[in-house]
C-alpha cells in the first residue's frame, strides 16, 4: 500500500519500500505537467528514442513478400515485356519482297479454334400482328398521339431551314449582303446623321 504524506511533492512515500508502480506514475505526472505548460511535449521513452516517434516503428517493418501461387503468375508478370519484344522482332524482320510473296506454312501442331457454336445467327424481325400498331416514336405522355417518321423529318427540315435563315439575318451585315448591299464607307457616316 502506498502512503503519500508530502503535499509539495505528492509522490513522496512516508515509510516502507518504493512500490513498483511509483516510477511509472512519477513519469506520467511529469509528462502531464509538461504537456500543460506552453510549448510542452511528451518526452520520448527509452524504447522510442531510436525511432523519434512510436508511429515510425510500424513504418519500418518490411512488408511480407507475396508468394507466387502458381507458375502462371510469373508468366503473366512478363507478358507485356514479351509482347513488346515480339513487336520489336516483327519490325526487324527482313523486308524481302520474295519472302513476303511466299505463303508461310502452317505448322502441324497449330490449333484452329471453332467458334460456330457461339456465333449469333442473323436477326430477323418478327412481323407484327394485324391488330397491333407499331410503337410510337415519341413518349406516350407527350401531346402527340400519332407519330410518323416522314412527318417528323419534314418538320425537321423546316425547322433547320428556319434556323439557318435566322442565323444568317442576325449576323452583322449578312442581311444587306444577301440583298446585294455593300458595307458603308467611313465618309457615309456623316450623311446618315450618325
From Swiss-Prot:
User: From its record, what is one biological process in GO terms?
Assistant: protein localization
Keyword annotations of the record: Cytoplasm, Nucleus
Q: Which GO terms describe its cellular component?
A: cytoplasm; nucleus
Reading the lineage from the top rank, the first entry is Eukaryota
Segments of this protein annotated with the region Disordered: 34-74
Mind telling me which Pfam families this protein's record contains?
RNR_inhib
Keyword Magnesium, does the record have it? Answer: no
- What Gene Ontology molecular function terms does this protein carry? ribonucleoside-diphosphate reductase inhibitor activity
Cytoplasm as UniProt keyword: yes
Instruction: Give the UniProt subcellular location, in the record's own words.
Output: Cytoplasm; Nucleus
Listed InterPro entries: RNR_inhibitor
Q: What is its main location?
A: cytoplasm
Give a short account of what the protein does.
Answer: Mediates the nuclear localization of the ribonucleotide reductase.
Family assignment from sequence similarity: Belongs to the DIF1/spd1 family.
Q: What is this protein called?
A: Damage-regulated import facilitator 1
Q: Which organism is it from?
A: Eremothecium gossypii (strain ATCC 10895 / CBS 109.51 / FGSC 9923 / NRRL Y-1056)
Amino acid at each position: 500500500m502506498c502512503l503519500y504524506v508530502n503535499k509539495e511533492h505528492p509522490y513522496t512515500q512516508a515509510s516502507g519500500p518504493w512500490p513498483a508502480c511509483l516510477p511509472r506514475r512519477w513519469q506520467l505526472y511529469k509528462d502531464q505537467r509538461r504537456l500543460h505548460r506552453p510549448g510542452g511535449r511528451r518526452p520520448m521513452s527509452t524504447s522510442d528514442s531510436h525511432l523519434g516517434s512510436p508511429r515510425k516503428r510500424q513504418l519500418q517493418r518490411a512488408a511480407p513478400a507475396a508468394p507466387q501461387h502458381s507458375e502462371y503468375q510469373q508468366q503473366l508478370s512478363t507478358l507485356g515485356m514479351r509482347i513488346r519484344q515480339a513487336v520489336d522482332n516483327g519490325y526487324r524482320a527482313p523486308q524481302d519482297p520474295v519472302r513476303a510473296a511466299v505463303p508461310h506454312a502452317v505448322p502441324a501442331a497449330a490449333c484452329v479454334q471453332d467458334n460456330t457454336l457461339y456465333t449469333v445467327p442473323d436477326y430477323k424481325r418478327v412481323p407484327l400482328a394485324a391488330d397491333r400498331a407499331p410503337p410510337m416514336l415519341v413518349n406516350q405522355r407527350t401531346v402527340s398521339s400519332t407519330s410518323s417518321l416522314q412527318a417528323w423529318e419534314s418538320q425537321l427540315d423546316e425547322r433547320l431551314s428556319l434556323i439557318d435563315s435566322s442565323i444568317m439575318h442576325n449576323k452583322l451585315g449578312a442581311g444587306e449582303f444577301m440583298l446585294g448591299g455593300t458595307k458603308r464607307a467611313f465618309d457615309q457616316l456623316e450623311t446618315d446623321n450618325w
